[in-house]
């Protein structure tokens, strides 16, 4: 009997795409409204059903609720983003694999090539940016719904997760240490929990979101 995954491929894909956006650019006014929307609350409630994710989801929910108490929440979130992800001092958490690995950051390029993907010309960040890993994982989970390439895409998913887990824990630790208000700290902890949870799903059957 085939074991069903705790989350469907489409659900993983959507969550990874959402997280990629949050780690790639500052939250604007529209993004802040979305964070506080019923839609995001429903998504977080879905994730919270998984015991491995419950604590990190609850922490992020608390930080989202706390944004309502912060004056100029959007501007302050933008400042947090800048301080963590754009600065180069010791109190930052730069979102690039090459900041944490003692080797050339070429793995993501090979993974993208295997997936038949390329970085958009408009993307001005280095290719080893966290958002690229997350967009790749989103693409791979959507592709797992196509039975003719499921085995290849599942193998590539595992390689991508393993590559990401080589440096994501240290990135998360830096977010926790250096995020003064805790939103991005909570977000990074949720991301790490999801990636580890996904990494435990060794062989996905074909299943659609219900």
From Swiss-Prot:
InterPro entries: Chaperone_TorD (IPR023069), DMSO/NO3_reduct_chaperone (IPR020945), HscB_C_sf (IPR036386), TorD-like_sf (IPR036411), TorD/DmsD_chaperones (IPR050289). The keyword Cytoplasm applies. GO terms for cellular component: cytoplasm. Keywords: Chaperone, Cytoplasm. Pfam families: Nitrate_red_del (PF02613). It comes from the Bacteria. Signal peptide: none annotated. It is found in: Cytoplasm. One of its GO terms (biological process) is protein folding. Involved in the biogenesis of TorA. Acts on TorA before the insertion of the molybdenum cofactor and, as a result, probably favors a conformation of the apoenzyme that is competent for acquiring the cofactor. Belongs to the TorD/DmsD family. TorD subfamily. This is Chaperone protein TorD. It comes from Salmonella arizonae (strain ATCC BAA-731 / CDC346-86 / RSK2980). The lineage of its organism: Bacteria, Pseudomonadati, Pseudomonadota, Gammaproteobacteria, Enterobacterales. The gene is torD.
């Amino acid at each position: 009997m085939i074991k069903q995954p705790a989350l469907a491929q489409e659900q993983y894909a959507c969550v990874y795409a959402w997280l990629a956006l949050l780690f790639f650019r500052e939250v604007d006014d529209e993004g802040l409204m979305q964070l506080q929307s019923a839609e995001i609350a429903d998504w977080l409630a879905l994730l919270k059903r998984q015991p491995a994710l419950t604590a990190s989801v609850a922490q992020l929910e608390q930080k989202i609720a706390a944004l309502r108490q912060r004056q100029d929440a959007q501007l302050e979130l933008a400042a947090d983003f800048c301080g963590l992800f754009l600065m180069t001092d010791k109190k930052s958490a730069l979102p690039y694999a090459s900041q944490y690995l003692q080797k050339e950051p070429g793995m993501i390029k090979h993974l993208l090539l295997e997936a038949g993907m390329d970085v958009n010309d408009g993307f001005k960040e280095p290719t080893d940016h966290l958002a690229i890993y997350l967009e790749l994982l989103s693409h791979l989970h959507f592709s797992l719904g196509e039975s003719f390439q499921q085995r290849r895409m599942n193998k590539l998913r595992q390689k991508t997760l393993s590559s990401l887990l080589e440096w994501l824990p240290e990135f998360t630790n830096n977010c926790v240490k250096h995020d003064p208000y805790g939103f991005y700290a909570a977000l990074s902890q949720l991301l790490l929990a999801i990636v580890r949870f996904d990494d435990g799903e060794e062989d996905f059957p074909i299943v659609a979101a219900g």
